[in-house]
């Protein structure tokens, strides 16, 4: 049955770019960049650690993203992760995907939002050529931050962006805090 499922054309409308790195890529990028915070450099141990745990809270499960985001702070890494995401999706029979990510969490080492978004967009364009898949990018604002208007404006400025989203922990961070951004996003994106 598993082989049959791979052959059926699929659409993936909710794929977090910075939440689905290959374990080997996470380890390689950490080693290349001198990132010392991984809980393990052993492939199997790290794979087990980053797997979502249904018995744990969303906040606990999001801890893995501290590490994936930690190694996605330069254009080459962001581009590579984007290309690999499209390759993996294509190999699973996905013909259309919407990759979402929060650009502002990739600015910690000085990249501009334009550089970050362009790295993803270029990865998508090249990945669509190489892997026979159609994809778009959705920009996320983080619920716990107060910059959702900035993110929705980035969506409007970049013609390659197909949507706006709120991501992050829901408890304690109401969507009502982002009402204006959602209203603008709905009207323009």
Which residue ranges define each predicted feature?
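Metal-cofactor-binding active-site regions of metalloenzymes
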Residues: 1-186
């Amino acid at each position: 049955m598993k082989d049959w499922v791979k052959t059926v054309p699929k659409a993936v409308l909710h794929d977090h770019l910075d939440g689905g790195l290959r374990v080997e890529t996470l380890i390689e990028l950490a080693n290349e960049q001198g990132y010392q915070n991984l809980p393990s450099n052993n492939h199997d141990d790290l794979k087990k650690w980053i797997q979502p745990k249904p018995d744990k809270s969303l906040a606990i499960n999001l801890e893995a993203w501290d590490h994936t985001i930690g190694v996605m702070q330069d254009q080459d890494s962001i581009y590579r992760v984007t290309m690999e995401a499209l390759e993996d999706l294509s190999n699973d029979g996905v013909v259309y995907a919407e990759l979402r990510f929060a650009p502002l969490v990739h600015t910690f080492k000085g990249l501009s939002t334009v550089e970050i978004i362009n790295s993803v967009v270029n990865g998508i364009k090249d990945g669509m050529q190489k892997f026979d898949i159609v994809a778009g990018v959705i920009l996320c604002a983080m619920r716990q931050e107060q910059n959702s208007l900035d993110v929705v404006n980035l969506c409007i400025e970049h013609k390659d962006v197909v949507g706006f989203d709120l991501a992050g922990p829901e408890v304690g961070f109401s969507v009502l805090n982002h009402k204006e951004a959602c209203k603008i996003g709905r009207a323009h994106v």
